[in-house]
Structure formats: structure tokens, C-alpha cells
Amino acid sequence: MKKYDVAAMGELLIDFTQNGYSDQGNPIFEANPGGAPCNVLAMLQKLGKNTVFLGKVGQDGFGYQLEKALKEMGIGTEGLCFDPTVHTTLAIVQNKDDGDRDFWFYRNPGADIMLCEDEIREELISDAKILHFGSLSLTDEPVRSATKKAVAAAEKAGLWISFDPNLRKPLWKSEALAKEQISYGFKHCQILKISDDELLWFTEETDFDRAVKRLQQEYGIALILLSMGKNGSAAYCGNQKVMVPAFVNKNTIETTGAGAVSYTHLRAHETDQYL
């Protein structure tokens, strides 16, 4: 019997999210726990699943805040490391009028980048059913090598692997490097969550169905989940396609983590039904 339904690795950071304006008209930013991998784990915990995180934060106030948040959610922190010299990664999230966001990062370096191969606890991975990761842990060394060690351990232990490109172009040295490393994620996953913008950017297609077919043929991905914002989402498995309309809120305020939420519900169902 596996101890964990899902193990995730990657960035754990502080999202400074705009939350109103001061009396002087300046934007006010709130320090929220963030990072796509742990957004997924947080939702899985709420759905009654057991999860564990592998990653690195700074040995600072923000790092301890993040550790506390994980423990309060019930996410396993056995794989969480602390860097004594590099601070916790920070993201500035500024909302647009349509509810979408702009991101700026303080990550040159940030603690999440500093996770090393010898800090990967393979026994945590082998004790899970699914390993989830994204491309932010492929942008730089040493975390890139650590991520690939975790993926190799998952494959050796027979886990399903899920991948979310979660493309943040400013964090990559070049788009060519981004495509190279995201292609690595495609090659090693059975479950892919990808946004409409990411799909068309990577494939250079203009049609979603044609772009998905290219990924299926080139990488053999079993299940592709496509998020399209206000246009809903779609799931592709072989020749089957299911479309779901969006739940549109005309007064959208904040969309950070929305993709992780929809992704999580389906993966919780997969854990129950297929693994």
C-alpha cells in the first residue's frame, strides 16, 4: 500500500498578490503561499488525498511561513529543504482589469533553484502513486538535474507522471531552452495539463485539435488536459475528446491557481478510479 497518492516537486514561493490600494492610491500586496505544484497538493488534500512535497525554500521568515502553510494543509514536508544562504523565491502578481495577471519574479537566484540531486528523497517518490512537476524546476541548475533524478526515480518505481508546463517566459534564458526542457516534460509524462497559449506557442499551430494531435503522435501522452480560460476546458484521450464550458464569473477578481484547481479534481478522480 502506497503512503501517498501524489508527490510533487518544484517551486514553493511567496506570491505577493495585489489586494487593493492604500489611501495614497498605491497598490497593496499580500504575501500568499504560492507555487503551482503545491497549489495542486493543497487541493488534493482538501479532496481527502495524501500528498508530499519535495522542494527548497530559504532559511528565512518566508520559508518558515511556507513550511507552516504546508503543515496546516496536511501536505507532507519530509522532502522540504532549507537553504541557509539563498532567500525564498518571490513572485509579484499584479491583476489586470479582465482578471488575468502579470508576473514578476525575484529569483536570481531563489531558493527553489538551489535544490540539489542529493537532496531528492527517492523513498518519498517510490511511496507515491503519481509524481507531478512543472517546467519552473527545469529553468536552471542545480534544480534541473534534481528534477530529472526525481523523474527517473518515479519511472523506476512505476509511478504515473504528470506535467504542467506553467510557462513563465521571463524565467528562461531563451525560448529555445524553454522548448527543449518542456519537451523533456512531454516525453516523460502520461498526464499533461497545458493552457491554450502554451499549446499554440509550443506547437506553432493555430488549431487546438491539430496541436493536441501533434503532441499525441510525437510524445504518446495518454491524457491531455487543455485549459482555455473563459472558453472552458477540454480533455483528450486517444481519439476521444470531452469539452466542458467555463463557469464564468462576470466579476472575476483573481485567477491565480485556477488551472491547478481544475487539474486537481480530475486527477483526484483518476487516483480513485485507475491507480
Segments predicted by a language model, with ranges:
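Conserved N-terminal subdomain of the carbohydrate kinase-like
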Residues: 50-133
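Short beta-strand/loop segments at the ligand-binding rim of alpha/beta enzyme cores
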Residues: 160-161
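Conserved phosphate/ATP/ADP-binding segment of small-molecule kinases
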Residues: 157, 171-243
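Anion (oxyanion) recognition and catalysis
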Residues: 45, 71, 155-156, 186
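Conserved small/polar residues in nucleotide/adenosyl-binding loops
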Residues: 264-271
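Short basic (Lys/Arg) and small-residue
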Residues: 259
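Active-site metal-binding loops of divalent metal-dependent hydrolases
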Residues: 12, 136, 165
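Glycine-rich phosphate/adenosyl-contacting loop at the front of the ribokinase-like
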Residues: 1-76, 252
